[in-house]
C-alpha cells in the first residue's frame, strides 16, 4: 500500500485512527471524546479485516486508543486490535499520558499495573520540555521513556518473523 496524498479525518489521534481503520469519517459516529470503551463496532469492517480476507498477514504494534472492554487485568481485553482483524498485537491501550500504563499482547495485559508513578508535569509545562505523563498505575515492566524503543523492537520482530509467502500489513 502506498499513500501518496493523505488527509487526517479528524483533529485528534483517535479520530484519525478510527478513520484509517474503518474508512468512516469520525464525525459520523459518537467518538468525539477520549474513548474508554471500544469505538469500532463488532460487525464494522476494518482495513485489517479486509486485508486478512485477501490473504495478508496483519499485525499491529503501538498505541490502540480506540478503546477496550476492560474486564480486569487477568482477563482478556476484548474490543481491541485482535478483535478488529489484526492477527497479532503488541502495544499500549492509550497514549503515554493516560494511565494506567501497561503493555498488551494479543488481548491480554502482559503485566498488570501494580506499581504507581507520580505526575511529572510542572507549572507552565510545554512540549518543548520533553516527556509528560500523569500519575497513575503502571506495570513494573513498562518505563515511560522506553515505550517507543520497545515498540520499535516488537515491530522489527514482526517483520523478521513474518510469513514470507504472504504480504504483511503492519
Which positions does each model-derived feature cover?
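Formylglycine-dependent sulfatase
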Residues: 1-170
